[in-house]
């Protein structure tokens, strides 16, 4: 009898161990939830430069897309579209690209995007969405909502729980407000949604911040730009929220949506803020400022990887003071390679890496009108 009981207990333990093998959460797989309306859904034209993506950046497919050969609930390389089958470029695209470009190679980034063009923030209210959905008259909007089983909030939570089996949720990205322009209760409504997400997914606000982007800015003629005043009040309601500026992010002819270049820049700004929240305050790769004069360039150093000396080429269109600094991956300055005026034209700077430890380093070129950074790999 004792032997039989022992065998049964042993069998139960082995069965439990085997059943748990399919659940393998990777702490180095950082997952970000994205939601909002059309600008987060993505309306930008996907161009050739957008179709090449680092394999460390992935998307959890939200809906079945035979046109993309993607199945709901599976991870894929994050080649746009990242939302639905026929959506376009969104801020999430260059958010993820910039994150993987600046984080260690051991870190992967995953995106879940459940966004609905034209919707009010009320669509994501856990309890109140039914009243809002019942008031909708536009067939196209009803059809989009139907793709998320009539409940985008619940759909996002279900997808997030699925993703939590694979990785760790590190943040929430929101871009919404055009359909709520003038609504002073918007910050309070967003706060409820944020708190509901934290509770339903067992998350803590101090480790899962909310990043909310401004709508098309007044400096681009944005027709909903007045909403940015309200959006910027969000941190007063949610201390762990951050507002991403849309100033100088270029837009489409409708002055409502960003164009592809605007989405790229806005996505990079989301990433820059997220990296800062994570404690990375050094120079960032792939976040060159928008106001770039013609013929400014910072090229890849050669050779790269490097063990001894390496050459860094750059070009400036006019005579100007140039700073060219090398930083370690923690953001500490290693050396200034320029620090003087240069005439217009092509130039090079030489850097001796013999005394440095192996790893990833960043070099940054700064002038009055340009900032650019690139990675350098040192191997011994």
PLM region descriptions:
Residues 1-26, 287:
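Bacterial Sec-dependent N-terminal signal peptides
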Residues 4-5, 231, 380:
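Generic extreme N-terminus detector
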Residues 5, 18, 34, 371-372, ...:
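Short alpha-helical segments used as structural interaction elements across diverse proteins
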Residues 7-10, 19, 224, 314, ...:
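Disordered, low-complexity tails and leader-like regions
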Residues 17, 25, 104, 165, ...:
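Generic structural signal for beta-strand residues in well-ordered domains
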Residues 25-284:
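Cell-envelope and extracellular/periplasmic
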Residues 289-302, 306-380:
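C-terminal outer-membrane/trafficking sorting elements
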């Amino acid at each position: 009898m004792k032997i039989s009981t022992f065998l049964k207990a042993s069998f139960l333990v082995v069965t439990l161990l085997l059943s748990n093998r399919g659940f393998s959460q990777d702490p180095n797989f950082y997952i970000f939830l994205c939601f909002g309306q059309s600008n987060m859904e993505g309306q930008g034209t996907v161009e050739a430069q957008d179709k090449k993506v680092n394999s460390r950046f992935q998307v959890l497919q939200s809906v079945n897309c035979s046109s993309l050969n993607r199945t709901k609930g599976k991870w894929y390389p994050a080649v746009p579209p990242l939302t639905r089958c026929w959506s376009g470029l969104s801020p999430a695209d260059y958010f993820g690209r910039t994150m993987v470009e600046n984080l260690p190679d051991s870190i992967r980034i995953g995106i879940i995007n459940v966004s609905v063009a034209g919707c009010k923030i009320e669509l994501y209210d856990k309890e109140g969405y039914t009243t809002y959905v019942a008031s909708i008259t536009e067939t196209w909007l009803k059809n989009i909502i139907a793709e998320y089983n009539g409940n985008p909030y619940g759909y996002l939570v279900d997808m997030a729980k699925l993703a939590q089996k694979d990785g760790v949720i590190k943040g929430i990205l929101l871009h919404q407000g055009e359909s709520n322009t003038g609504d002073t209760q918007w910050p309070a409504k967003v706060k409820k949604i944020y708190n509901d997400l934290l509770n339903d997914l067992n998350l803590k606000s101090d480790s899962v911040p909310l990043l909310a982007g401004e709508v098309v800015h007044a400096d681009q003629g944005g027709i909903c730009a007045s909403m940015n005043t309200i959006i910027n009040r969000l941190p007063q309601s949610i201390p762990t929220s951050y507002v991403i500026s849309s100033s100088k992010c270029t837009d489409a002819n409708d002055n409502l949506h960003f164009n592809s270049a605007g989405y790229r820049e806005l996505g990079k700004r989301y990433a820059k803020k997220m990296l800062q929240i994570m404690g990375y305050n050094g120079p960032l790769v792939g976040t060159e400022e928008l106001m770039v004069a013609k013929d400014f360039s910072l090229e890849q150093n050669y050779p790269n990887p490097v063990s001894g000396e390496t050459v860094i080429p750059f070009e400036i269109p006019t005579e100007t003071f140039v700073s060219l600094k090398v930083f370690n991956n923690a953001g500490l300055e290693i050396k200034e390679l320029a620090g003087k005026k240069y005439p217009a034209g092509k130039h090079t700077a030489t850097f001796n890496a013999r005394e440095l430890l192996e790893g990833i380093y960043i070099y940054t070129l700064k002038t009055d009108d340009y900032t650019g950074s690139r990675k350098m790999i040192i191997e011994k």
